[in-house]
Amino acid sequence: MASERHHSIDAQLRALAPGKVSEELIQYDALLVDRFLDILQDLHGPSLREFVQECYEVSADYEGKKDTSKLGELGAKLTGLAPADAILVASSILHMLNLANLAEEVELAHRRRNSKLKHGDFSDEGSATTESDIEETLKRLVSLGKTPAEVFEALKNQSVDLVFTAHPTQSARRSLLQKNARIRNCLTQLSAKDVTVEDKKELDEALHREIQAAFRTDEIRRAQPTPQDEMRYGMSYIHETVWNGVPKFLRRVDTALKNIGINERLPYDVPLIKFCSWMGGDRDGNPRVTPEVTRDVCLLSRMMAANLYINQVEDLMFELSMWRCNDELRARAEEVQSTPASKKVTKYYIEFWKQIPPNEPYRVILGAVRDKLYNTRERARHLLATGFSEISEDAVFTKIEEFLEPLELCYKSLCECGDKAIADGSLLDLLRQVFTFGLSLVKLDIRQESERQTDVIDAITTHLGIGSYRSWPEDKRMEWLVSELKGKRPLLPPDLPMTEEIADVIGAMRVLAELPIDSFGPYIISMCTAPSDVLAVELLQRECGIRQTLPVVPLFERLADLQAAPASVEKLFSTDWYINHINGKQQVMVGYSDSGKDAGRLSAAWQLYVAQEEMAKVAKKYGVKLTLFHGRGGTVGRGGGPTHLAILSQPPDTINGSIRVTVQGEVIEFMFGEENLCFQSLQRFTAATLEHGMHPPVSPKPEWRKLMEEMAVVATEEYRSVVVKEPRFVEYFRSATPETEYGKMNIGSRPAKRRPGGGITTLRAIPWIFSWTQTRFHLPVWLGVGAAFKWAIDKDIKNFQKLKEMYNEWPFFRVTLDLLEMVFAKGDPGIAGLYDELLVAEELKPFGKQLRDKYVETQQLLLQIAGHKDILEGDPYLKQGLRLRNPYITTLNVFQAYTLKRIRDPSFKVTPQPPLSKEFADENKPAGLVKLNGERVPPGLEDTLILTMKGIAAGMQNTG
């Protein structure tokens, strides 16, 4: 029987995949899934394997005909399972889905290797096929009339900051991500042309081992991660792919420059890309990020950096064995050798542990650098462990210049002695790493909600007896802050009465004052509403003894704040103290998540576009170089989508060679999970930023702008009429989605709400999007869009042609609609209807039906404007991938909806089935069940629910 079924998975896949788009994808998919099913049968017997395949078949039937009776049939099968079997089935489907995702990634890399894809085709939602190849981009710019020298100059002045954040609806655990990487690797090698029979056998065994190890690992995090865990998680990518990926990528840039006739390398002091992090610095609504956490995270990253550099310097000591050097280097080597430290035998080194002979001057100098790095690492380790170290500050590197100086001396000496080719080897790579990563590997941004700083200043003014700062109007606040900033008197009295929140803000500032300033990026103020929010942070930094204050970055994220942002920025620039203080540079962060939650995706996207244009004009007027910091989520609902399309659709004149972008927890894996992906991501950010500056997208025609403006108003009204004003909405949302159960997933270190209680407004943007993604309804992304299109076409039939023209000619509008189409490709109103049918009260069902009708109407209007007969007709690869992925997701959706029903309604009748797995057939109490919730929920239901959540998140690929 198993062998018949074995054939059917391949046959099922072929029946599902439209046309013969990619034979490899079907082969890879079938290979991995069949291997998994064999393992499942070995471990748990044939009954379980058959059951899992039957589920896939029923789901595949539903996908083909959209016959909703199939969902009921599937639900009846799944609800009767014994608790242990339910967990196994959910886990099996989740693993099959993960394997399908890996097959897609390998097929994609394979396809990219075989042919450079045509520009602008984005057939993986995360970013991977969107080719923004650096070589092609440079050639294209030259063909558009730029001189190679202009391109080189633009590159030298460019900077991209990637900011890793820990919003980990990164639903997978690190233990599993590493196993996935090894599965991907086996599959890649198996598909190589020159694989021998012996290799194939060994790779087959390795593949079997890794798939089984992944299946035997608990997918559920049993404890909520701390901010320190999140930071280590983010750092593992820096460590494993980015550290070596950066010099490799910069060499590719050198090659690309050579190809357009530039015969010099990119200078090593031009780090095209820098890395920053919010993990351990983002305290907005996260009480777990304390001043101690921030201190720990900074020391930990300095320790990791020193460790990585020690290895690089040792490799370099092997390489630089030359004796020829310039006089300056020889004199320095003699100076080093005359110190007592150089005489000692250092037994804790494996290489070069005795005194280095004087005829190896480069090694002598690098030996001293290594000693200092060793001390740097040990001091950080002591401070982390005990808060104290006997190693003095003089014996360690505290400033990047101290570290660079001996390395630059070696570089200069090699070049002067005719050894430039050697200088441009590992030494150049190391210099580039030092300029990219500094002594702290990543700079830590600090983020805090504006209200917290207001609390502190209010406590100070009240204590000083000059009134309550909180009750002052904005003008009075500004006037007082400026006069204090210009004055010298200390404001922070030692006896200031402090609440826990106030102590936290001041404690964090004091940590900034005690640690090396190069550990930190800017200080970001979330929910920023007025210029006084910025000056308040400047004043507090000064009061807490921060000598070199962090740049302060306002984050505008709600619709009204975005509309007021240009005026706020102008007010800051027209304040003489501030404009003199910032040295001609300002960063402003724009938030995609909360603006989308506040007004819907279309209006948020447009308001972000306009706010950026206006702020760029203000900055130009005051002669300030503005860097916009884009707080994009991984999901489309939170501003996500393919990287280079997002950058190229920004308004002209808003990037000018410098941009900051958040890389959210859930997409770090897709962008930096392995070397090839990391290389592509670095290319894509660099190429798109360069292209945007040198060949900006078109500005919208006045009539497009006017129509967009009017549609945004209609879209916001429609969105808010449902989400904010409709009295039934909150109850409907809570019952039709797993929002209430979401908090149990141990997804991240921060709570799901900003404040306890309340409706949609207090819910964070992530659980809001995550909940709608789970039911495949994606409401926040499309709600309001259909109403806006309909209004425009009803108002004047000519607008239909105008919308088509906007889609074809205006990058911003096209990207907005293409991303929407991708979301519709993953949505399914039939599935959303199942949740309604099972979970929603009778009186709310008509409301759910109305919303589903709006979904269908919006989808049809979108297709007409884009000129597509069918969803994703322009992207056959993504379409095929989704067809193969959907049956797994549908099974998980049905499982989730029925599990929620059983959790919420204990009287729901279930017909029990006999045990499926041979492992649990004779046991009453299955192992491995964890009750997260006391006795309220029958055993196994919570684990099953969490597995379905993780699986659906993995299947959607742009989660929360």
From Swiss-Prot:
Active site: residue positions: 167, 597
In-chain residues carrying the UniProt-annotated modification Phosphoserine: 8
Catalytic activity: oxaloacetate + phosphate = phosphoenolpyruvate + hydrogencarbonate
Pathways involved: Photosynthesis; C4 acid pathway
Alphabetized InterPro entries for the sequence: PEP_COase, PEP_COase_bac/pln-type, PEP_COase_Lys_AS, PEPCASE_His_AS, Pyrv/PenolPyrv_kinase-like_dom
Cofactor(s), by name: Mg(2+)
GO terms under cellular component: cytoplasm
The entry's keywords: Allosteric enzyme, Carbon dioxide fixation, Cytoplasm, Lyase, Magnesium, Phosphoprotein, Photosynthesis
GO molecular function: phosphoenolpyruvate carboxylase activity
Key word Magnesium present: yes
Any Pfam family hit: PEPcase
Activity regulation description: By light-reversible phosphorylation.
Keyword tRNA processing: no
EC code: 4.1.1.31
GO biological process entries: carbon fixation; photosynthesis; tricarboxylic acid cycle
Domain of life according to the entry: Eukaryota
Subcellular location: Cytoplasm
Chief location of this protein within or outside the cell: cytoplasm
Family note: Belongs to the PEPCase type 1 family.
Protein function: Through the carboxylation of phosphoenolpyruvate (PEP) it forms oxaloacetate, a four-carbon dicarboxylic acid source for the tricarboxylic acid cycle.
Subunit structure: Homotetramer.
Protein name: Phosphoenolpyruvate carboxylase 3
Organism, scientific name: Sorghum bicolor (Sorghum)
